[in-house]
Amino acid sequence: MGLFGGGNSKSTSNQTTNNENTNIATQGDNLGAVINGNGNSVTMTDHGLVDALVDIGGYMSDSTQAAFGAASDMAYSSTEFAGQAITDGFDYAEGVNRDSLDMAEGINRDSLNFGRDALSVTGDLMTDAMQYSSDAMLASIEGNAGLAGQVMDASTTMTGQSLNFGLDTFSGAMDSLNQSNNNMALLAEFTSNQSTDLARDSMAFGADLMAQYQDNISASNYDAREHMLDASKTAMQFADNMSRSDGQQLAKDSNKTLMIGIVAVSAAVGLYAISKGVN
């Protein structure tokens, strides 16, 4: 060992890193998360749960819109049908009233024509009788003064009979005209009452029909909402059950089952709402 000499030392260190693959299958309330890792790389998957729920939400939204759209269309159709029923009732009542008034007008016109013709015939008979009496009187005076008294008596009698016949005919025509006017007044009153009753019944029928349709639509909407709530609860239960699955393939199968079930329930709700509104 010299003056400036020193000691020598040597050391060796070894380190070994082992990488292991670890798959962890989870159970319980884990929200559908499955974690697996390889060394420092860790991945987590829900096996399509979120995407499935998004698709299901879209299906449920479309089904709800279709159901409420059908209910809205049925409400509009029922209101339009009730309004048309009321309009048709008034149109029918107006037609009946018009026909009745036209018939009464025709009867009155025929009665007036009959009275006019009767008075015309009576006037002609009286004119002819008086002319015949005048002619007979002149003939008797000119031909045989002895028969003048008898001719005058005969003429007077014939004139009286003609006047009586004309008076009876005139009275009969007036009685017939009065009776026709009375019948026309009764017919007009009857048709007016019938038209009023028909219009009232048409309005009552329209109101009842509208109320019935509104009740059906309200019941349909209520049932549709209840079915949608049940479908939502079922979807959430499926999602919860799926999140508790023990393997990747079982989770995928649960997703498909959930989507098919929700689509079927939504279609059933729409058909039920439509059939309820139609009935």
Curated annotation (Swiss-Prot):
Topology in the lipid bilayer: Single-pass membrane protein
Keyword Repeat among UniProt keywords: no
Keywords, ordered alphabetically: Host membrane, Membrane, Transmembrane, Transmembrane helix
UniProt region (Disordered), positions on chain: 1-28
GO cellular component, one term: membrane
Bias kind Low complexity: ranges: 9-23
Protein's UniProt keywords contain Transmembrane: yes
Domain of life: Viruses
Bilayer-spanning residue ranges: 256-273
Localization in the cell: Host membrane
Record's protein name: Uncharacterized protein Gp-j
